[in-house]
Amino acid sequence: MKLTATILSAGLWLGVAAAQQPVVAPKTAPATHVTKDQIQEFFAKLPPGRILDSPIRVVDVGGYKVGVYAVTRPKDSPQDAIYHDTNMTEILYMLEGSANLITGGTIPDGRPPARPGGNFTGTKIDGGTSRHVVPGDVIITPGRTPHLWANIESDMTYLVFRPDPDGTQQLR
């Protein structure tokens, strides 16, 4: 019995050792580095007082694209509910400012996009969930999820990371 257990144990370890193989990186860029200085310089070049959503970098990561965007949203800017008809998730990292972000629910007065590939918009969201967002917070909004900024307390700047399985973003 002891010999059988020893043989089985040795066979198990040999199988594990044989299954281990070197990991080879795919033939894509190993990583993309966007530095703090690059981000700050990018924001500094944006014109003040406007809603802007501008790509800092968009890269192909092997089968899909990922974008890093700089967003500015002045306190007194008009706010629309928005719905992106895409699988692209938005991961928001708030840098400055605070407001409530309403996600989910429905846009009862939704207007179709003004151009192909554009967004559905409206004036409000019914049945959504409101969250107070402050600097340092992260919000993950799946594609095809209505969202709306409300009660903006101060000018906002934030980063949005957009994994794009449909490949709709332009490389930058």
Q: What does each model-found stretch correspond to?
A:
Residues 5-17:
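Bacterial N-terminal signal peptides
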Residues 98-101:
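Short beta-strand segments in beta-sandwich/barrel cores
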Residues 89:
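Alpha/beta-hydrolase fold active-site loops
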Residues 92:
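Structured binding elements
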Residues 106-143:
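Short acidic-glycine-tyrosine-enriched beta hairpin
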Residues 95:
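A cytosolic small-molecule/anion-sensing beta-strand core signal
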Residues 18-86, 171:
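A short, N-terminal "cap"/entry segment at the start of jelly-roll beta-barrel domains
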Residues 132-137, 143-167:
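Ligand-binding loop in jelly-roll beta-barrel domains
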